[in-house]
Amino acid sequence: MERIAIIDGNSLINRAYYAMRNPMITKDGIFTQGIFGFLNMMEKIKKDYEPAYMVIAFDLKAPTFRHKAYEGYKAGRRKMPPELAMEVPILKDILRAMNIKQVELEGFEADDLIGTIAKEAESCGMEPLIITGDKDELQLATDITKIILTRKGVSEFDLYDRQAMMDKYGFTPTQFIDFKGLMGDQSDNIPGIPGVGEKTATKLILEYGSVENLIANVDNVKPKGVKAKVEEHAQLAMMSKRLATINTQVPMDIDFAEYKLTEPDYDALIELYSRLEFNRFLKKLNVQRSGGTGSGDPAAKPLAVDAEKLEKVCVREDSQLA
């Protein structure tokens, strides 16, 4: 089963940026620590998991369907610092030079694109690996789809599939959405039920299974204080669950042949690495270009594209979702 690495671009560069104690700045004043950490993370993923395919999903500034459904969605979240904002377009240039596909779509978050690609990949017989620092994406875990969640900066990860979710939380990845619907999410300003925290939300999910079933059986809820909260804020819980649910049916074209890892544009990449003063990456790239393998990174090996195999890989156009 071939693997596809689906990376949450905004989440990972943000974590990489804040993981560095001291800023990295070139002599020309370009901040680079977010890019540097992101590239290190990509190297680790390629080395440890050897994906045949890779795609990076990014958020756009435009409001999404969640902002339209709830005006307060993500209100109060701190803005990206200008130093990090400076790094994002440079990272995208590097990814283009690497011939790694990037996806973004107005009206949707990167989470939704990731969920849609992962679901399609699994249906095509691939093994999706979702790399993120966002716990929201744990709801996408299955027996096949794995979530690689950054634990400390971007150098340490926890791996989740459906069973790992059950072991840690006691409920399924799908029920993780109900869990967030009850307790909310401060980082996204999803309200949940006021006064219901992690412990109570877990107890209610384990007992009733879903927000809908909890509301339908509210007369049986104990203690009375929790019952009163559920009765009063039932609609808020339902809205919160909708906000927390990742859309896995985004109308987008998916052609896995475009996600195949291939050789980079060496000249473009060397120019970018030189400007960013990434000497270690430059040295490794030169070894790769001369036919070496760098430090054992499978991405440094020429990846031949099997045309016959690619013809069998799913290609989905958004018109097929009608």
Regions found by a protein language model. Name each.
Residues 1-131, 135-162, 236-239, 245-253, ...:
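Noncatalytic, basic helical substrate-engagement surface that gates or grips nucleic-acid strands
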Residues 50-55, 100-101, 123, 142-146, ...:
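Non-catalytic nucleic-acid-binding/docking modules located in mid-to-C-terminal regions
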Residues 53, 107-109, 133, 309-322:
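Conserved DEDDh/DEDDy metal-dependent 3′-5′ exonuclease domain
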Residues 75-78, 285, 318-322:
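A short, flexible N-terminal coil/short beta segment enriched in small residues
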Residues 127-131, 282, 314-316:
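Short, hydrophobic beta-strand segments that form beta-sheet elements in well-ordered domains
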